[in-house]
Regions:
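Short acidic/polar alpha-helix capping motifs at helix-coil junctions
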Residues: 1-4, 15, 38-41, 89-92
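Short, well-ordered beta-strand segments in beta-rich or mixed alpha/beta enzyme
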Residues: 2-8, 39-66
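N-terminal leader/targeting segments and the first structural element of proteins
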Residues: 4-7, 21-24, 28-31, 40
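Short, surface-exposed ligand-recognition loops at beta-strand->loop->(often short) alpha-helix junctions
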Residues: 9-17
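A structural signal for short hydrophobic/aromatic patches embedded in well-ordered alpha helices
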Residues: 18-19, 65
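An amphipathic, aromatic/His-enriched active-site/gating alpha helix that lines ligand/cofactor pockets
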Residues: 24, 30-36, 55-89
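Glycine-rich beta-strand-turn "strand-cap" elements at beta-sheet edges
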Residues: 40-46, 75-123
Length: 123
């Protein structure tokens, strides 16, 4: 899985315009082949700091999205930002959920030494 995170620090008077752009992009992006999810987040301490978080099945799907006209529209918003877009691409080889939390918490209760998730002790 590929996680694509775009952080935007918006000029305050342009916040509504950027939000409208992101909202108009989110649903069509979520419908693209290979897109697992596309969500918009707002920093609770700074409403002008926004994050677009996308999850993709493969890098090939993400690359196709990045080359699209729709993504070009997002790149065109740079003039409405206080600083350049911060873009990060993460390749996730493994993910865990609540079962891992329960397992870890049960280990702690049993006074078992912590491991790195692969059986090796954490020092």
């Amino acid at each position: 899985m590929i996680v694509f995170r775009i952080t935007m620090n918006v000029i305050p008077v342009k916040q509504l315009e950027i939000m409208q752009t992101l909202i108009s992009m989110a649903e069509p992006t979520a419908q693209e082949a290979g897109c697992i999810s596309c969500r918009i987040f707002c920093d609770i301490e700074d409403k002008n700091r926004l994050c677009l978080l996308e999850e993709w099945k493969t890098r090939k799907y993400l690359d196709h999205h990045i080359a699209s006209h729709r993504f070009g529209v997002l790149l065109g918003t740079e003039a409405l930002l206080r600083e350049p877009l911060e873009i990060q691409i993460f390749t996730v080889s493994r993910s865990e959920g609540m079962d891992a939390v329960h397992r870890i918490r049960n280990q702690k209760k049993s006074n078992i030494s912590p491991t790195d998730g692969h059986g090796s002790l954490i020092k």
